């Protein structure tokens, strides 16, 4: 089946938004759920039938779209890992498999940068409480990870997310005036305009720090604009660690033999920016 005849989107070709009403109509009318249907991931088409793509992890998202529209019993996505791990084995030698995750926890992990499941894949499944199974195509008999309504994590372990090659930017007021809501709004507008993704925020009365990802090399241009209004300090090639469900031992593991530039703690999440 040509997926472009089923998934209809807007014309934002590289990260298209789904027209859910039309997509639901196409799938409900033309898919026979009791036979094997094979189609493609990642693609859709706009109102003029031009091909569009669904953005990062678009193939997994395609499965979620079909599952939502067909009221599927479950969705299984196949990866080159045993399932969802509590840490990247490349950076943490004792990484463990998570047997079960709630939708909420999976979305939190994905928001902070966990790469196995994208938030947009989870959202339609959560709406209809359709379970998602993440399994290994290398070892297909392994149980993998289930994502569903219920317990946040099983086993309940600290979860580590690593983002390398980050940029830590600190803005401070030139005249010691407060950094107010209108300043912050302007700053975020500039980051958005320069396609710079903000991964951490910390602010005080006269300073504002962010850890960002300059994927498109726009920082020099942005820095020139910001420097007209703020004193700008920055540190390149830093690493951002996020720990969900942190404890003292988890923090020690991250901080060992590193220079900590910034640390931020909320109820369930600790974020640490380091220079190694």
Model-assigned labels for residue ranges:
Residues 7, 45-47, 84-85, 140-143, ...:
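Flexible loop/turn segments at secondary-structure boundaries
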Residues 1-3, 32-35, 47-49, 70-74, ...:
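Short coil/turn connectors at secondary-structure junctions
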Residues 30-46, 109-133, 170-184, 235-254:
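Electropositive, surface-exposed helix/loop patches at the edges of structured domains
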């Amino acid at each position: 089946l040509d997926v472009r005849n089923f998934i209809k989107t807007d014309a934002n070709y590289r990260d298209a938004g789904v027209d859910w009403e039309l997509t639901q109509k196409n799938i409900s009318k033309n898919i026979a759920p009791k036979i094997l249907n094979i189609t493609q991931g990642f693609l859709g088409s706009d109102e003029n039938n031009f091909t569009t793509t669904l953005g990062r992890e678009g193939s997994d998202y395609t499965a979620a779209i079909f599952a939502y529209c067909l009221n599927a019993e479950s969705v299984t996505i196949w990866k080159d890992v045993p399932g969802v791990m509590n840490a990247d084995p490349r950076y943490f030698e004792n990484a463990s498999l998570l047997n079960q995750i709630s939708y909420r926890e999976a979305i939190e992990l994905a928001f902070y940068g966990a790469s196995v499941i994208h938030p947009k894949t989870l959202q339609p499944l959560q709406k209809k409480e359709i379970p998602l199974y993440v399994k290994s195509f290398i070892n297909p008999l392994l149980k993998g990870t289930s994502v569903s309504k219920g317990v946040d994590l099983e086993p309940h372990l600290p979860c580590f997310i690593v983002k390398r090659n980050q940029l830590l930017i600190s803005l401070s007021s030139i005249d010691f005036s407060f950094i107010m809501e209108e300043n912050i709004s302007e700053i975020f507008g500039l980051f958005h305009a320069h396609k710079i993704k903000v991964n951490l925020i910390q602010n005080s009365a006269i300073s504002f720090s962010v850890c960002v990802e300059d994927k498109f090399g726009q920082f020099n241009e942005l820095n020139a604009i910001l420097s007209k209004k703020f004193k700008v300090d920055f540190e390149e090639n830093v690493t951002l660690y996020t720990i969900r469900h942190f404890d003292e031992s988890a923090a020690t593991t991250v901080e060992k033999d590193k220079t900590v530039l910034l640390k931020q703690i909320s109820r369930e999440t600790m974020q640490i920016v380091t220079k190694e």
